[in-house]
Amino acid sequence: MKIGQVSKKTNIPVQTIRYYESQELIQSSGRTEGNFRIYNDQVIDQLKFIKHCRLLDLSLGDIKRINKLCTNAQAPCHEVDQMIIDQIKQVKVKMDELKQLETQLKALSNSCTQSKKVSDCGIIKYLQESF
């Protein structure tokens, strides 16, 4: 099938599919006489796998490593487990950063009352301050 059909089946943009191919995460089955890339059903499964990994915020490098590990069914699973543990650590860091951001935004929101004019807005004054 052509790349447009793959895009529709996977709900992944054509440009992203081409990018994944350039990063050697997938490969086309060949080309048509008109020089269009053609893909088989295995690529659909690979793209769904990649999409699922990206939803877990795994990097393309991690996905490549997992794909490589999948080629050896006897390989130990601890490397994949470690990737997930590392991902959990990264998520915790992001959550801490988001909590700090929330605190900052709440403080900003509290600095502005609805009875003031924009010229008196504490939020705007804060944002105009140089760092």
Where in the sequence are the language-model features?
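Basic helix-turn-helix/winged-helix DNA-binding cores
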Residues: 1-68
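Short secondary-structure transition/capping segments
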Residues: 41-42, 73-75
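Alpha-helix boundary/capping residues
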Residues: 51-54, 70, 87, 112
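C-terminal regulatory/oligomerization modules of transcriptional regulators
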Residues: 74-131
